[in-house]
Amino acid sequence: MSAPPVPVVKPRLTFLYNGEFVDSDLQTKSVRESEDGRLYETFTIGGTLEVTTESIRHGDAIEWVSWFEYKGISDKSGQVTQLCDCNINVPFELDLYPDSLARIQEGRTTLVYAHNGSDWNEYDFSCDVESYGDRVLRKAALSQLPRYRAGNTNVKHFAPIGGRSSHGAFPFYNINQGDYGVIFAIGWTGQWNCDLERALDGTINIRTGLEDVDWHLLPGERIRTSSIIVMPYSSGYEKGQQAFRRLLRDYYSLIGKPGRPERAPLCMSFWGGLTSDGLVERIDKIGAERLGYEFAWVDAGWYGQFTEPSPNEFEGNWWAYTGDWSVNRHFHPDNLEDVSAACKRNNLGFLLWLEIERVNTKLPVVKAHPEYLIGDMIDLGNEAAWAWAYKTIANLIRRLNISCYRQDFNITPLGRWRDADAVDGRKGMHEIKYIMGLYRLWDSLLAEFPHLIIDNCASGGRRIDIETLRRSLPLWRDDYQCPANHDVDAAQNHNIAISRWLPYHGTSSGRIVGDTYRARSCYAPAFASSPLYSSTENPENLSDDDCAWIRRINNEFKKVRELMQGDYRPLVEMSPTVDRSTWSAYQYSLKDEGFVMAFRRAKSPFCEARFELCGIDPLKSYLFEDSDTGQTFTISGKELSEKGISVVIDQPRSSKLYFYKAIQG
């Protein structure tokens, strides 16, 4: 039997209004289209609750988001519950079982590719592949992580932990059956949820929205809820994933857009608790030695009025002053303006860390404006609190010529929102207004500062979704890389998994100099290192050999980064946990060129591996260059297509990087 035709997906949302089921497909709508191709479909419930769904198509993909507005003059609208911002049915054929003991035929298993989110673990971003049929089957090479277990039924439930969109779960999914499938991604930087349910005929119902809502609107209130991208495909799993990455790169990311940086940044990072003299000395070292960095990244610890030393993130009480965003004049007597000037004279962008949403409740802003808070969070849904947050950030960007604003968020907000909801009886409303305020904050900053990029941290990669990706990029995708000598094999796993989805993300190789395996393990579209991070690392101790190695690595990374604009493909199937007896490898291809990166891990007994490459033209030949030695060799496209490429790595815990380009056959 042939696969179902690729469906044309249309927006559909459902909810209960005062207990009555509302289906947008069954409503009479007014429709208008904007000049940029956006479609606005509006219907009204009960004569007073106006619901507008805004949608736009990019090729086979469609995105939509819904807005709710109360037009009545009485005290409130009816009650909205069981809201599904997306409620669609996607046709899939039943999995075939020739007999009770046989395996499902290849290509006829329906698989749900659901990746883990970030949770400071080695298995972050790994994939849990679940099949739907008369039984529950799994690919043997991938383990089931019990966090997502919903029982051996035809319903599977997904949700993040604690109100941050990619904490524990990852709001990007691919349901695949052979060549046919559908990718969808949820846009909500709070507590979304997703249910997948399979019908007896094989159809899969996709339901996404905000978790556990029960609210009404007041006169004049207008809110939005979660967005969704749905992209059907008929080209197979790998090409479907590549198409989705291109979609995010071309239509959602700010990188490469007018006024913004052409590429994600290459940074040297510093602890903000260093003195200004120490920061200036380190930044001048970058320029004097021509190390090749593009941004100076100043992290936490630069703010608050304390005098005790804070030599690194693990010493001192800098954390107690989070929420006081005045520069610490004891350690930075020139108000960080000398640091900004050092960046400018060394042709570096200035990246500065803040955590604008979290505040120590003993600080002056809390005493002056307790109404700004939900617990220990600045309430971005409160207009006065929002204005304070915007003014605080914008003044720093303007005064210090900030090129990249780094926003962290190290708390789980869900319980705080729910506690606030309990006061006024509108479950989910504080979350909705808070998240709308977050989007407005970033949109306003990007509008006022056309050069700006926003780094979205949130404890390392815990707020990654399509709404944050259109406004920011995660330069620090996981806090598992926090230790100075973090496990780089885990970084390889993270990189290989998350690159399936995101065209732009990053991490850091840490403070260790001279370890090429470590540095290459952390190459991503954005990359950082910190050889002069804290008071422990003295610029005078950075030798000529150290500087030469840093220059070589940064130059190599920039060459890699250009090719990361292309299509990505992992060349091995990784286990969720780190296996040091294996190899890991991946490929990027951009038109007729690309690179292959391979790692032989510390306990691998194998000195050779062969990899099948994608994007190879059998009628052409390909010139390969070894990045370590500069040696070149040629392989015909026919041989590459039939046999792949053999990579030899003689020593354990070593890597090989080959650049290649097509030449005439």
Predicted regions: what they are:
Residues 261-394, 400-404, 414-416, 421:
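Aromatic-lined carbohydrate-binding/catalytic grooves of carbohydrate-active enzymes
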Residues 336-343, 430-449:
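Alpha-helix-loop-beta-strand connector modules within alpha/beta enzyme cores
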Residues 635-665:
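C-terminal beta-strand-rich structural cap/linker in extracellular carbohydrate-active enzymes
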Residues 66, 220, 296, 343, ...:
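Conserved, mostly hydrophobic/aromatic
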Residues 215-234, 653-661:
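Short Pro-Gly-centered flexible turn/kink motifs
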Residues 2-197, 211, 621-634:
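Polysaccharide-binding surfaces and accessory modules of carbohydrate-active proteins
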Residues 9-11, 16-25, 31, 209, ...:
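Active-site-proximal substrate-binding groove within the catalytic cores of carbohydrate-active enzymes
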Residues 11, 16-23, 171-187, 233-253, ...:
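Glycine-rich, aromatic-flanked loop segments that form ligand/cofactor-binding clefts
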